[in-house]
Design a protein with these regions (language model features):
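N-terminal acidic leader/helix
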Residues: 1-31, 61
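Short intrinsically disordered terminal tails
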Residues: 1-2, 66-70
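Short, charge-rich amphipathic interface segments used for partner binding and complex assembly
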Residues: 29-68
Length: 70
């Protein structure tokens, strides 16, 4: 893998982490500010947070594996 490809992967990992952090913040805000009235929002926000965190974890693992292979 070229240094440019590794750099692009690292950038993707950072973007995925930022998105996961934003989703976690949305979940936190729901818990802190809008529950119990907005309880119906829990499944959608929780799923979006889970998906974003999983995407980050997969991107991070792929980047680390590619980095170790070089």
């Amino acid at each position: 893998m070229t240094p440019e490809e590794l750099k692009a992967m690292n950038k993707a990992v950072k973007k995925a982490k930022r998105i996961a952090t934003e989703k976690a913040g949305e979940l936190h805000d729901l818990v802190e500010d809008r529950l119990p009235a907005a309880y119906e929002e829990i499944p959608a926000i929780a799923q979006a947070t889970y998906d974003a965190c999983k995407a980050w974890a997969e991107a991070d693992a792929a980047y680390k594996a590619a980095e170790a292979a070089n």
